[in-house]
C-alpha cells in the first residue's frame, strides 16, 4: 500500500511540474493576423518573434499594419491582384504614400517592385525608403531622371535612373541605370558597428550598388514607405503622364 501511495505522489508531482508556466516558452511564437486562417488571404502579413530578432513579410493582400502617408493630393492606391498599386496623376504635385504603423531598426529591408515605363522627362519618382525625419532617411527613388544625369550615365531610351540616397549624417547620393518594365528586389541592409552605429548598403537584385557608414545608430528607428511622388529633382518637366508602380511584397528581417 505504501509503495502504491509513493508512486501516486511521484506521478502527481511530475504532472504538476510538466504544466508549470515557468516551463513554457514563446521563443518561436508565430503571431498572425486574425484572418490568417481564411484561405482567401493566405498571404496576409505574419510576424515571427524570437530572442534573436523579428521577421515580417507583407504580401499586400490587404493593408493591415500600414497607414496612409500621402502629403499632396488624394490617396492614390489600392490592392490589385495581390499587389499594392500606387500612382500619381499628370499635371499635379501629388505625393501618394503608405507607411508601416510600426518602426524598425537594424536588419534587412526588401521591396519587390515592378518598375514600368515612365513619362519621358517627367518629375515622378517611385519610392522605396526608410524614414525617421528629413535628415534620417534612406531612399531608393526611381524615375526618368534629369537629362544632365542621363547624359552623364549614357542612359538608353529604355533606361530609368535609380537614386540611392542617405539624406544626412552623412549625405550621400549615388545614381545608377536600370531597365524599365521589370520586377526588382530593392534591399536596404542596416548592420551595426561595434559602437552601435549603422552601416547601410543599397542592393538591387542582391548586387551591392552603394554603401555608407552613418554617424547614427540603433536608437534611430524607421518606418517603411512605398510611394509614387511627383518631385522636381528627378526630371525636367511637371509630369505629363500618370506614373505608377506595383509593390508585390515588403520584407523585414531583424538582427
Where are these regions (language model features)?
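Bacterial Sec-dependent N-terminal signal peptides
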Residues: 14-50
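Extracellular glycan-recognition surfaces and repeat-rich motifs
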Residues: 62-84
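Short carbohydrate-recognition loop motifs
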Residues: 76-92, 158-162
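Secretory/extracellular carbohydrate-interaction modules
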Residues: 88-158
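Beta-strand-rich interaction surfaces with strong enrichment in secreted/lumenal proteins
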Residues: 95-102, 172-178, 214, 236
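Ligand-recognition surfaces built from glycine- and aromatic
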Residues: 108-110, 216-255
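Short tryptophan-centered beta-strand motifs in secreted/extracellular beta-sheet-rich domains
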Residues: 111, 182-192, 200-202
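Short, aromatic/His-centered strand-loop micro-motif at the edge of beta-sheets
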Residues: 163-185
Amino acid at each position: 500500500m505504501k509503495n502504491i501511495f509513493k508512486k501516486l505522489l511521484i506521478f502527481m508531482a511530475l504532472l504538476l511540474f510538466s504544466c508549470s508556466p515557468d516551463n513554457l516558452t514563446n521563443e518561436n511564437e508565430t503571431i498572425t493576423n486574425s484572418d490568417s486562417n481564411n484561405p482567401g488571404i493566405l498571404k496576409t502579413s505574419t510576424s515571427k518573434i524570437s530572442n534573436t530578432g523579428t521577421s515580417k513579410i507583407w504580401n499586400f493582400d490587404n493593408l493591415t499594419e500600414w497607414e496612409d502617408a500621402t502629403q499632396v493630393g488624394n490617396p492614390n492606391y489600392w490592392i490589385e491582384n495581390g499587389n499594392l498599386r500606387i500612382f500619381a496623376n499628370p499635371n499635379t504635385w501629388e505625393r501618394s504614400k503608405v507607411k508601416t504603423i510600426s518602426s524598425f531598426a537594424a536588419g534587412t529591408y526588401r521591396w519587390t517592385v515592378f518598375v514600368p515605363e515612365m513619362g519621358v522627362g517627367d518629375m515622378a519618382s517611385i519610392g522605396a525608403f526608410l524614414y525617421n525625419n528629413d535628415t534620417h532617411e534612406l531612399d531608393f527613388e526611381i524615375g526618368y531622371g534629369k537629362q544632365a544625369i542621363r547624359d552623364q550615365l549614357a542612359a538608353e531610351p529604355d533606361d530609368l535612373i535609380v537614386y540611392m540616397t542617405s539624406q544626412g549624417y552623412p549625405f550621400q547620393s549615388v545614381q545608377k541605370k536600370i531597365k524599365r518594365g521589370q520586377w526588382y528586389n530593392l534591399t536596404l541592409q542596416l548592420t551595426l558597428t561595434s559602437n552601435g552605429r549603422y552601416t547601410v548598403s543599397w542592393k538591387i537584385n542582391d548586387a551591392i550598388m552603394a554603401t555608407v557608414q552613418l554617424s547614427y545608430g540603433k536608437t534611430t528607428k524607421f518606418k517603411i514607405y512605398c510611394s509614387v511622388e511627383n518631385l522636381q529633382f528627378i526630371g525636367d518637366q511637371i509630369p505629363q503622364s500618370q506614373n505608377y508602380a506595383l509593390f508585390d511584397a515588403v520584407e523585414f528581417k531583424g538582427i
